[in-house]
Amino acid sequence: MPTRVCCCCSALRPRYKRLVDNIFPEDPKDGLVKADMEKLTFYAVSAPEKLDRIGAYLAERLSRDVVRHRSGYVLIAMEALDQLLMACHSQSIKPFVESFLHMVAKLLESGEPKLQVLGTNSFVKFANIEEDTPSYHRRYDFFVSRFSAMCHSCHSDPEIRTEIRIAGIRGIQGVVRKTVNDELRATIWEPQHMDKIVPSLLFNMQKIEEVDSRLGPPSSPSAADKEENPAVLAESCFRELLGRATFGNMNNAVRPVFAHLDHHKLWDPNEFAVHCFKIIMYSIQAQYSHHVIQEILGHLDARRKDSPRVRAGIIQVLLEAVAIAAKGSIGPTVLEVFNTLLKHLRLSVELEANDSQKGSVGSVTVSSKDNDEKIVQNAVIQTIGFFGSNLPDYQRSEIMMFIMGKVPVFGTSTHTLDISQLGDLGTRRIQIMLLRSLLMVTSGYKAKTIVTALPGSFLDPLLSPSLMEDYELRQLVLEVMHNLMDRHDNRAKLRGIRIIPDVADLKIKREKICRQDTSFMKKNGQQLYRHIYLGCKEEDNVQKNYELLYTSLALITIELANEEVVIDLIRLAIALQDSAIINEDNLSMFHRCGIMALVAAYLNFVSQMIAVPAFCQHVSKVIETRTMEAPYFLPEHIFRDKCMLPKSLEKHDKNLYFLTNKIAESLGGSGYSVERLTVPYVPQVTDEDRLSRRKSIVDTVSIQVDILSNSVPSDDVVSNTEEITFEALKKAIDTNGMEEQEKEKRRLVIEKFQKAPFEEIAAQCESKANLLHDRLAQILELTIRPPPSPSGTLTVTSGHTQYQSVPVYEMKFPDLCVY
């Protein structure tokens, strides 16, 4: 009887419930009843309006089975749901989807790993279904939170933990695919969701044992690796997420990366950080690259007070990002990037200078901090170099001017970098760092004319005396000049100072000097000669300085030299030889021999370049004589570790020196204008010499004049019986000495105007005129305006003359006039 009652009751139940009940076997181990499942599917397709009821009833049964821990029936219910979901594609499926998502949520909330994985797999299948019309009211907040939590699973069993994490990553991937394609439903890009999704993916990517350090875009992993390795699957999902990011939501996807790296202290060491940003730069669209760079710069500003290693790690990440971004779109904020980098460079130098001034207390710690700051500085310079070298020429010239404007130059206020707290040591350090940055930016820069590469606004501060106070500064200045002068890649052939037997073997590339280059040398040639001349006479020069000076002379000869410039360069070389022999600057014997070797190497080079046989013969003869009698005058010997130096140079034979008269005779026979060779080269005096802290060349010239004047014998014979008193000595010094000095000055001026080239005289007159103009302007600024007059002041308004009187009670009288 009870059985009949049940049969009667079941017959009264709705058909969809009977069909649903029939798919469940008595023993869950038998699995889904396929025949009844086909009937249920056919019924759902035939009557789509019943889908919501079928889904609700399945959800009811599944919830009951989950509570009662009937895992077998749960598996059957989810399998049936999946089949119905895949078979039905209509508008009526939307209510069914709500029931489906409710059942998936029930499985994810359960504490059993198998059910969580089962729910995730069903959600992934659902995510791959393309709906005809998306449902905008549907939200996935719960699934984002739950899948993110599964990505951080800490299950005691490693296999189960890995399985749960893989399920969480696949779930996040499903959410992304389901929502990210719909532009009208952008909730997934909101910060509260990205703050969960991105760290969850990075947490699993962090488990990669060996971080990929390839420069190119990494190859896509295989399907087997994705299914078995959480790190590989997380990286694939991260790439997919970034690849779908647009202009408006790019920052929301990148900022959680910084938070994760900060929280887990992954900037030092920064291998994982570099790996992450390589993935970001290669995954996003090229036109959005500059957004990522701006975010890195902003984070660098925010962490400016952190340890040097953390800042260095961020800058190295920026370097990798810039190296990738520079190949595509860089964006309009190039100067902002360089400005931020230079600001952090100054900050690093300032911190280094402050640490070095703390004294010997904690010297080990201070030394360690200094080394860390050097890491920061090198990272900044490399980043500037990579960024600058990939810019187009028009932008690179702007960056060159921008960096040069930051270089502190003594006596001028043109630089825009705050160095008030750096001190002398810090200022020198920032000069070196900026010049190193400039060197990297100018590397590979090719300008059609030298005027474009070295404009006056760039050349003047570059050749400033302030950048000659240290041998390293001078090296960097010369290297920057070489980058800009060497337009035919000849510098590598000239590397190393040596006597070249046959210059033709070097296969020097050169072109005919254009009119713009000739004009440049007429205007700035004396400035270049002066820099080389003074650079050779510095006491702290090392071998590299002489090599770079030799290369400078050779490059000027190749790129900029016509007949007049060749004569000027030979004059300069002879003047250097004379300065080494006379030794007015009290240089050491090594430096004097180094100058002699430099002159020999250059005259050997220029004689073969202009191919005048008599000149080549004279140079070769002097070099042969030096090889036999004075090898320390040749670069191959003087720059060796152990070289015997002479005690003096005054007693040497004239055959060891290059003689002006023989050079003039040889060049004159070939049509060169050699009148200027007989005029000794004297570097022009500039205004910067008067402002510089270094010993001015004016002082050197005045000392020479004093020595000469004192050595000239007096024509007047003083009587032995003359009374010698203090007043007499004072009078003799005031009259006789001054007269001799005036005579000598007049003689030098007359000789200069008779023999010196017009360009040199014009340059000196121009510098004096500029100095006079500046002094006059200062005097006019200090001039006090006269007091107002009661009669008024004359003003012109709209073409009419008017007087504006000043009331007496408003006038200010001197105190002595008031009683």
Curated annotation (Swiss-Prot):
Modified positions (Phosphoserine) in chain numbering: 360, 363, 420, 692
**SUPFAM superfamilies recorded:** ARM repeat
Q: What is this protein called?
A: Protein EFR3 homolog A
**Upregulation:** Expression is reduced in animals with impaired hearing.
Q: Which family does it belong to?
A: Belongs to the EFR3 family.
Name of one Pfam family that matches:
EFR3_ARM
GO CC term, one of those recorded: cornified envelope
Q: Name one GO molecular function term.
A: protein homodimerization activity
Please outline how this chain is modified post-translation: Palmitoylated at its N-terminus, anchoring the protein to the plasma membrane.
Q: Which gene encodes it?
A: Efr3a
Listed InterPro entries? ARM-type_fold, EFR3-like_ARM, EFR3_Homologs
Keywords, alphabetical: Cell membrane, Cytoplasm, Lipoprotein, Membrane, Palmitate, Phosphoprotein
Expression by tissue: Widely expressed. Expressed in neurons of the superior olivary complex of the auditory brainstem. Also expressed at lower levels in the cochlear nucleus, the lateral leminiscal nuclei and the inferior collicus.
Protein function? Component of a complex required to localize phosphatidylinositol 4-kinase (PI4K) to the plasma membrane. The complex acts as a regulator of phosphatidylinositol 4-phosphate (PtdIns(4)P) synthesis. In the complex, EFR3A probably acts as the membrane-anchoring component. Also involved in responsiveness to G-protein-coupled receptors; it is however unclear whether this role is direct or indirect.
Q: How does it assemble?
A: Component of a phosphatidylinositol 4-kinase (PI4K) complex, composed of PI4KA, EFR3 (EFR3A or EFR3B), TTC7 (TTC7A or TTC7B) and HYCC (HYCC1 or HYCC2).
Q: How does it sit in the membrane?
A: Lipid-anchor
Species in which this protein is naturally found = Mus musculus
Q: Does the keyword Zinc apply?
A: no
